[in-house]
């Protein structure tokens, strides 16, 4: 597998914490140490690379011939970390999916969902757990080249509700844009607010 991560501190702090280390076999700790120090781990069964740095540029370091059955994007919310929710970055992510590959995220933001739809991905709502019934969504699943006959029924996902579909026609669905691929979050948010102000 490949991972993209900008901040080494959580893993560094975890590996220094005895309570964390005691949760895992030494083999797992060795893998995590290698990832932290070297950015990769290899043995006969496991091959993993973690590319430390800005995901917008690091994604290009994944070899062109490698695509994924599943991509999980576990970033902060678009308002806090818009860099990884832009049209430009999500388009790069889509290109790394295999045919009928899946993209999954905790985000259910209208701007994210509208961008995924505009990238010709079929999107589904991830149902909240029973103990989180007060929430209307637990995230978004997007599938490339969706073929219902080849996809098993999944009790954890559902089509978007009428309310969710209507939400994609509001100003909230205006996407985040980063045409230069390296703009700071403040600039990306400012650009979107300007676009929203001109939207009817």
Language-model-detected regions and their locations in the chain:
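Conserved beta-strand signature within the Rossmann-like core of class I S-adenosyl-L-methionine
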Residues: 70-72, 99-107
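S-adenosyl-L-methionine
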Residues: 13-62
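A short glycine-rich, Lys/Arg-flanked "PGG" loop and its adjoining helix->strand segment in the class I
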Residues: 83-99
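Conserved SAM-binding motif I beta-strand of class I
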Residues: 1-5
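Conserved Class I S-adenosyl-L-methionine
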Residues: 113-138
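A short acidic, Gly/Pro-enriched loop at the edge of an enzyme's catalytic core
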Residues: 60-70
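SAM/dcSAM-binding transferase cores
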Residues: 42-43, 138-200
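Conserved SAM/SAH-binding beta-strand->alpha-helix loop
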Residues: 7, 109
């Amino acid at each position: 597998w490949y991972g993209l991560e900008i901040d080494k501190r959580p893993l560094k702090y975890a590996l220094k914490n005895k309570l964390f280390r005691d949760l895992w076999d030494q083999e797992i700790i060795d893998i995590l140490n290698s990832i932290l120090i070297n950015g990769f781990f290899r043995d006969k069964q496991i091959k993993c690379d973690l590319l430390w740095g800005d995901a917008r540029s690091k994604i290009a370091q994944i070899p062109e011939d490698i695509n994924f059955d599943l991509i999980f994007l576990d970033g902060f919310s678009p308002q806090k970390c818009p860099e990884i929710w832009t049209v430009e970055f999500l388009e790069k992510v889509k290109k790394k999916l295999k045919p009928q590959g899946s993209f999954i995220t905790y985000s259910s933001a209208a701007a994210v969902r509208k961008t995924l739809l505009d990238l010709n991905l079929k999107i589904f709502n991830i149902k909240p757990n029973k103990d989180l019934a007060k929430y209307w969504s637990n995230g978004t699943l997007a599938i490339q080249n969706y073929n219902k006959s080849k996809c098993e029924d999944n009790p954890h996902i559902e089509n978007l509700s009428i309310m969710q579909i209507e939400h994609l026609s509001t100003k909230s669905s205006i996407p985040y844009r980063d045409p230069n691929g390296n703009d700071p979050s403040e600039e990306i948010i400012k650009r979107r607010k300007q676009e929203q102000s001109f939207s009817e």
